[in-house]
């Protein structure tokens, strides 16, 4: 490749690559979601090798929230903090900072 995408002034954000979204057993699983893992890991490696910051977001909900259908929202229970579903997919390289969102519902 002739174009360098990353340097020390760049950043890469990996968004919500968690078990509940990426694993077929997850409560909000995206069909074929884990198939993009090699591409994500390659981008993370390229960014890291070129000095870019790599950060990760993580959906991180309390057990009860108006966000969930059982509590009046529209979404199934997912990414409840401290559960398997909320964990970053085990094959995802995640050595950078994490930003947890949805922490208040």
Model-predicted regions and their roles:
Residues 1-104:
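Active-site acidic carboxylates
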């Amino acid at each position: 490749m002739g174009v360098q995408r990353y340097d020390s002034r760049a950043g890469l954000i990996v968004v919500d690559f968690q078990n509940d979204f990426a694993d077929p057993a997850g409560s909000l699983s995206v069909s074929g979601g884990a198939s993009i893992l090699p591409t994500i890991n390659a981008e993370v490696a390229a960014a890291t090798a070129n000095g870019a910051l790599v950060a990760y977001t993580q959906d991180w909900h309390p057990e009860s929230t108006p966000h969930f259908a059982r509590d009046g929202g529209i979404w199934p229970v997912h990414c409840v903090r401290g559960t398997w579903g909320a964990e970053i997919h085990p094959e995802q390289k995640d050595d950078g900072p994490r930003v947890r969102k949805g922490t208040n519902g």
